[in-house]
């Protein structure tokens, strides 16, 4: 855009007539205006190359689809690969053959206590058991009838759990889908509103977040200092890490903008809510704000315990933990921990203590096919494979749904018959173009 404007206005491309803003705040705009630069012609050429590739693919292949299938269809450098990924996953699901397997779980008590804890069969005669049917599970239970269980080993350690990095476009869309059930389009629409600015009490029209189309994990020193100031006042010095948290941006990232973060860390979600913003704006701002503040906090420290229990060559393993210092988890956690592990509170125990088995049971399971993509997992796959850019994730998903190549089934994305026919045709005749690595 800046290159086109410079040409129309007759400006010298070598002059410093380009300004950039990472946030629409007074500070951000003044900083941009005071540090102009010349137009980066390499970025201009990169955009031109992408546009040419898009046209070479789209302009040539779309008419081919019109002739072979029907009018109105389209193909594209990114959208056709996205359809192929979804079709390939569907074929994996169809080809999947579920396998039966069994597990053996025990309830134990130590030192005469009535309270029990859980342990799972881990090895049999030093090998991982493969119990493929009930008969094999029954053999293990028979082998353990009347057996004397002993505690072989108790291992204690401290586990350090680090906070998640601040959001990129991809991770924001994924987490908003998981936590808020927002589709990617809804997330980006709301993020755009927060970036452009909303009315905040005593602040007027204020841009609340930095630019929301980014693949960078970098944050400014000023933002980190503001986060520390809030953390210190709210939680105390022990919640500030000894060394600043710095997150490594992926190698294929452009790193043109900071990570997505609040422009004013001191503006809490409650303050934003009190200003009368929409429900979506409040929810998304709260998610972005909590994630950013937590990313700059101390690690969570957990005391972990692992207990090995054996009888007749069968080894059971119990694991559990307790929180020693909550750290960043006082504010935010990316995903729920294993609830079963949380509830498995182990008693004070050491090697050689008496142990009694209270119950042994066998449980049947079946292996599960790979899950269909959701918007969140598809965006994650885009990022991991380098397909598209943060600015194209939502348009790509919107296009393949609007073209009726893909449809929603709850949160899942599945190919339509039209999508599968189109993908098969593209894969047979233009396999390199629909290759993920193209």
Where are these regions (language model features)?
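Toprim catalytic domain recognition across nucleic-acid enzymes
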Residues: 1-380, 392-396, 401-405, 410-413, ...
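Short, intrinsically disordered, charge-balanced linker/junction segments flanking boundaries
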Residues: 432-438
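Flexible beta-alpha connector loops of hexameric P-loop NTPases
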Residues: 179, 385-386
């Amino acid at each position: 855009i800046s290159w086109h404007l410079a040409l129309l206005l007759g400006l010298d491309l070598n002059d410093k007539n380009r300004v950039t803003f990472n946030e629409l705040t007074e500070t951000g705009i003044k900083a941009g205006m005071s540090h102009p630069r010349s137009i980066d012609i390499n970025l201009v050429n990169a955009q031109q190359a992408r546009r040419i590739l898009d046209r070479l693919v789209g302009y040539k292949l779309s008419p081919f689809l019109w002739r072979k299938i029907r009018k109105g269809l389209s193909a594209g450098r990114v959208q056709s690969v996205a359809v192929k990924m979804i079709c390939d996953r569907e074929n994996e699901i169809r080809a999947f053959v579920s396998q039966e397997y069994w597990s053996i779980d025990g309830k134990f008590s130590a030192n005469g206590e009535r309270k029990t804890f859980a342990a799972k069969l881990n090895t049999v005669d030093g090998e991982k058991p493969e119990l493929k049917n009930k008969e094999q599970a029954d053999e293990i239970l028979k082998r353990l009838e009347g057996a004397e269980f002993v505690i072989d080993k108790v291992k204690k350690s401290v586990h350090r759990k680090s906070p998640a990095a601040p959001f990129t476009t991809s991770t924001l869309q994924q987490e908003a889908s998981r936590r808020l059930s927002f589709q990617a389009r809804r997330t980006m629409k709301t993020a755009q509103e927060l970036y452009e600015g909303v009315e905040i009490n005593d602040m007027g029209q204020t841009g609340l977040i930095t630019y929301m189309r980014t693949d960078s994990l970098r944050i400014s020193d000023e933002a980190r200092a503001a986060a520390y100031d809030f953390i210190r006042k709210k939680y105390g010095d022990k919640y500030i890490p000894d060394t600043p948290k710095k997150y490594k941006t992926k190698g294929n990232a452009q790193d043109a903008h900071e990570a997505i973060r609040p422009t004013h860390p001191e503006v809490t979600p409650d303050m934003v809510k009190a200003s009368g913003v929409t429900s979506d704006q409040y929810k998304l701002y709260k998610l972005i704000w909590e994630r950013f503040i937590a990313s700059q906090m101390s690690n969570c420290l957990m005391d972990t315990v692992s207990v090995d229990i054996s009888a007749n060559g069968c080894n059971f393993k119990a694991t559990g933990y307790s929180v020693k210092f909550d750290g960043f988890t006082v504010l935010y956690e990316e995903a729920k921990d294993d609830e079963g592990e949380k509830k498995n509170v182990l008693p004070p125990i050491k090697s050689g203590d008496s142990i009694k088995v209270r119950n042994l049971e066998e449980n049947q399971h079946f292996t599960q096919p790979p899950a269909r993509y959701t918007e969140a997992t598809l965006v994650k796959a885009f990022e991991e494979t380098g397909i598209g850019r943060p600015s194209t994730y939502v348009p790509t998903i919107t296009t393949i749904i609007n073209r009726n190549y893909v449809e929603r089934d709850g949160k899942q994305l599945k190919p339509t018959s039209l999508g599968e026919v189109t993908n098969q045709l593209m894969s047979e005749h233009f396999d390199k173009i629909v290759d993920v690595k193209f």
